[in-house]
Regions:
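The beta1-alpha1 cofactor-binding region of Rossmann-like NAD(H)/NADP(H)-dependent oxidoreductases
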Residues: 63-75, 107, 231-232
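Catalytic Tyr-X3-Lys loop
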Residues: 103-122, 137, 141, 163, ...
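Active-site helix of classical SDR
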Residues: 125, 159
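Substrate-binding pocket helix/loop in short-chain dehydrogenase/reductase
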Residues: 100-102, 106-114, 204, 214, ...
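Alpha-helical segment proximal to the catalytic Tyr-Lys
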Residues: 130, 172-176, 246
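Canonical Rossmann dinucleotide-binding motif of NAD(H)/NADP(H)-dependent dehydrogenases/reductases
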Residues: 5-37
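A glycine/serine/threonine-rich, flexible loop-to-helix segment
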Residues: 176, 188-221
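Short C-terminal tail/terminal secondary-structure segment
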Residues: 2-4, 96-99, 226, 237-238, ...
Length: 261
């Protein structure tokens, strides 16, 4: 953890904060003096809250379904009621559910992928904008993915491509309101076993093979030949969220060890 205090007195919403990258972001924001609103639909977010409070940090949690606009609005309302403002929004919800060729996806599965990996970011941006416009200040960091190209996850890739487009367009539209919008395109990242599984279990041998192809592609086409760590992703996200990146907006920063897709 950094000894810096980049988020002192700043109110920071972190979505998807019960585990993985989101948990790492929430812990470090709190360690750097931030007031954290942790949004997740898993009860495991309460364990992260306990970790923060045990080290003297300031945080609250909200269980919310961010695949709905009502869920996103509830998170912003909680932040305003508890802290009075929102300085930073970090959109971290998402993740591929199935890994298989596009023609193997059903209509229902495609909709679920888009609901998981595009709409939470879209809804949270929409929900927080009125507050940031009123403040004439704010920072949004969207967690995207290197996987906007590659095999066996096209609905997820399309969703993250949408996140990248949203990032660029919001930055252009709201620079005049003092709002910066950037994204980190994460590559393959090593993480502890997930308490709440993100991917559907591969049932057939074909599904196992398709998933393995994605894993192999990630390592084989990465210059550095390895997965990143959660801390390496957290470092990039919080750089963009902090005043250190005050002259950056509309950027999508790849953090994937040179991943070429």
């Amino acid at each position: 953890m950094s000894n810096r205090q980049r988020f002192t007195d700043k109110v920071v919403i972190v979505t998807g904060s019960a585990q993985g990258i989101g948990r790492g972001v929430a812990l470090q924001v709190a360690a750097e003096g931030g007031q954290v609103i942790m949004a997740d639909r898993s009860e495991y977010v309460e364990e992260v809250l306990t970790e923060i409070q045990c080290t003297g940090g300031d945080a609250v949690t909200i269980n919310a379904d961010l695949e709905t606009y009502a869920g996103a609005q509830a998170v912003v309302v909680k932040a305003i009621e508890h802290y009075g403002r929102v300085d930073v929004l970090i959109n971290n919800v998402g993740g591929a559910i199935w890994m298989k060729p596009f023609e193997e996806f059903s209509e229902e599965e495609i909709i679920k992928e888009v609901n998981r990996s595009l709409f939470p970011t879209l809804w949270c941006c929409r929900a927080v904008l009125p507050t940031m416009i009123k403040q004439q200040s704010g920072v949004i960091v969207n967690v995207s993915s290197i996987a906007t190209r590659g095999i066996n996850r096209i609905p997820y890739s399309a969703s993250k491509g949408g996140v990248n487009a949203l990032t660029a367009s919001l930055a252009f539209e709201h620079a005049k309101n003092g709002i910066r919008v950037n994204a980190v395109a994460t590559g393959g990242t090593e993480a502890p076993p997930r308490k709440v599984p993100r991917n559907a279990n591969p049932l057939s041998q074909n599904e196992k093979n398709w998933m393995q192809q994605v894993v192999d592609q990630t390592k084989d086409r990465t210059f550095m030949g390895r997965y990143g760590t959660i801390q390496e992703q957290v470092n990039a996200i919080l750089f963009l969220a902090s005043d250190e990146a005050s002259y950056m907006t509309g950027s999508v920063i790849p953090v994937g060890g040179g991943d070429q897709g």
